[in-house]
């Protein structure tokens, strides 16, 4: 027997079982992690294709290896499709992740020790926007802006004051946990006053931007980064866009050979498939449903007496502030998980609790919207979440209520078939 000719279930029963069990897990829960989604069968097929065998250092028509004719076509398709999707002149589809997309922009535009101004982690920013444990916080002089202490909205006056004081080389807009729209035009006004570069990280809202449901940063930012999963419903990966082709050339060199070696051609092919899906009219309807579902989820939780940060949402994210309820984010997320609802604990702005505990939870609607959930379904989900939270306020042992909600979850998700 030649092991290299076997299928997965023949070669590695352990990994095969893990995949089977993970499929069951994904199909049997209400997925509310805001950064997760379900890719289409077409994207899955492309991602598992034999393009994984091909090394292709460099860029189309400028490779360091021969035999790249077909993968060049795949990468060019991905580039042209995403440029059309976002109406921009430059795109790089090679970043392995959103973090590496951000790193490539830093490498292209900054020198070690330069000042960067980004949203603080506890206000909803991302690790790669200057957080102390991250490379961006170690290599650069990172200054953070926060949200307003009363409204929890981005404080553009504070950003302007900090920019004038610190004269950053780069101003970063973007977030991992902020439920409201961003005024990219206002960011550009601030940037122009201090002579900085402007990077917009739209990893969470890329789908909203692509469909016109959120202001596009393309006309305002020198560089725009994103992941290709989340609201874009593609494979896990990164993306860099710009209206400025000269900056694009710098970014190309920064990513390769500056940061990465060979690109993942099977992932790039899957990105191309996702971008083609994103260009279809049905995708805009999907994004509109994602937003409507988030509003329904937020409203149902508010009706049950729970504080929703900023009073609602403009996108796919709902942040539940549990401080007045005496519940930690960790306790809530773990109890919800046992009840068949997956989300994540999340810091609340000006949170004094440990980031490993937190005072809130982050909920998101993309994944269940992909399965077919509508507003009425998310109203039910909101009440399920509230039931669990109510139980945590009143009882140390929430197991009976968790089982009750788990039964309700099972009945609801049976209406929305998963992968065949």
From Swiss-Prot:
Keywords: Amino-acid biosynthesis, Cytoplasm, One-carbon metabolism, Pyridoxal phosphate, Transferase. It catalyses: (6R)-5,10-methylene-5,6,7,8-tetrahydrofolate + glycine + H2O = (6S)-5,6,7,8-tetrahydrofolate + L-serine. Gene3D superfamilies: Aspartate Aminotransferase, domain 1, Type I PLP-dependent aspartate aminotransferase-like (Major domain). Pfam families: SHMT (PF00464). The gene is glyA. Pathway: One-carbon metabolism; tetrahydrofolate interconversion; Amino-acid biosynthesis; glycine biosynthesis; glycine from L-serine: step 1/1. It comes from Rickettsia peacockii (strain Rustic). Signal peptide: none annotated. It is found in: Cytoplasm. CDD domains: SHMT. Its main location: cytoplasm. Its EC number is 2.1.2.1. GO terms for cellular component: cytosol. Catalyzes the reversible interconversion of serine and glycine with tetrahydrofolate (THF) serving as the one-carbon carrier. This reaction serves as the major source of one-carbon groups required for the biosynthesis of purines, thymidylate, methionine, and other important biomolecules. Also exhibits THF-independent aldolase activity toward beta-hydroxyamino acids, producing glycine and aldehydes, via a retro-aldol mechanism. (6S)-5,6,7,8-tetrahydrofolate binds at residues 121, 125-127, 246, 354-356. The record marks 229 as: Plays an important role in substrate specificity. Belongs to the SHMT family. Its cofactor is pyridoxal 5'-phosphate. This is Serine hydroxymethyltransferase.
């Amino acid at each position: 027997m030649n092991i290299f000719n076997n299928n997965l279930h023949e070669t590695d029963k352990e990994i095969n079982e893990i995949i089977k069990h993970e499929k069951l897990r994904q199909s049997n829960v209400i997925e509310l992690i805001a950064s997760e989604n379900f890719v289409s069968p077409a994207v899955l097929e492309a991602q598992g294709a034999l393009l994984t065998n091909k090394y292709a250092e460099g860029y189309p028509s400028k490779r360091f290896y021969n035999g790249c004719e077909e993968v060049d076509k795949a990468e060019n398709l991905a580039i042209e499709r995403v440029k059309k999707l976002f109406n921009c002149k430059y795109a790089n589809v090679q970043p392995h992740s959103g973090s590496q997309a951000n790193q490539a922009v830093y490498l292209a535009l900054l020198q070690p020790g330069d000042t960067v101004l980004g949203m603080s982690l506890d206000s909803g920013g991302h690790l790669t926007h200057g957080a102390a444990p991250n490379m961006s916080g170690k290599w650069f002089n990172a200054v953070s802006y926060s949200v307003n202490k009363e409204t929890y909205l981005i404080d553009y006056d504070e950003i302007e004051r900090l920019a004038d004081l610190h004269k950053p080389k780069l101003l970063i807009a973007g977030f991992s946990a902020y439920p409201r729209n961003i005024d990219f035009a206002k960011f550009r006004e601030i940037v122009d006053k201090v002579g900085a570069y402007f990077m917009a990280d739209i990893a969470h809202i890329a789908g909203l931007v692509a469909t016109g449901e959120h202001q596009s940063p393309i006309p305002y930012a020198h560089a725009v980064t994103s992941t290709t999963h989340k609201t874009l419903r593609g494979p896990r990966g990164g993306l860099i866009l710009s209206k400025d082709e000269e900056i694009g050339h710098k970014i190309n060199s920064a990513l390769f050979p500056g940061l990465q070696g060979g690109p993942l051609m099977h992932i790039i092919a899957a990105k191309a498939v996702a971008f083609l899906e994103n260009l279809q009219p049905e995708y805009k309807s999907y994004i509109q449903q994602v937003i409507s579902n988030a509003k329904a989820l937020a409203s149902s939780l508010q009706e049950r007496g729970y504080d929703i940060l900023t009073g609602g949402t403009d996108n796919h994210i709902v942040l539940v502030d549990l401080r007045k309820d005496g519940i930690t984010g960790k306790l809530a997320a773990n109890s919800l998980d046992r009840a068949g609802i997956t989300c994540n604990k999340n810091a609340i702005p000006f949170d004094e609790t440990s980031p490993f505990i937190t005072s809130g939870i982050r909920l998101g609607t993309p994944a269940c919207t992909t399965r077919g959930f509508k507003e009425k379904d998310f109203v039910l989900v909101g009440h399920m979440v509230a039931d669990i939270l109510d139980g945590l306020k009143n009882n140390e042992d929430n197991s009976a209520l968790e089982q009750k909600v788990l039964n309700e979850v099972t009945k609801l998700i049976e209406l929305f078939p998963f992968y065949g």
